[in-house]
């Protein structure tokens, strides 16, 4: 932001894509931004449970953010998102099944932080949530599982995050990664329609 000449992140409005609504949060924008950063970083971290899952999905979402940032006229952000997409694709060569190297919490939380910080700077938080809906679903599956178990002592999913639920349901690790990646590609196409 400091190098953007103040052209980004002015005001406290948020944009809701697909409906093209703009809502001014006022002072509530600060906790909203904090929530987005913390939630998205942790959601990407929760997604990093299978070989190639987080890196493959993040490569697609980052490439989508390149297109979104160019279409909104933010010509410096494609460099950041392009670097993230390229790094994830390079990392994916060594992280695909069977993985020779693992991302770990530091890598996955950094990726979530970069994606969310860039989206916040461009006021595209909800557009990021559309493209990265897999991250949101993964995080919600953990929240639902823990909350429901504490209340009833029963589980909704076989295991949380939800990618492990599918694994325990008989899906192979590569099938889960492939399906989640295809779903992310479709979500990115939906996000493109919102531009």
Question: How would you label these PLM feature ranges?
Answer:
Residues 7-21:
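Membrane-interface helix termini and inter-helical loops of multi-pass transporters
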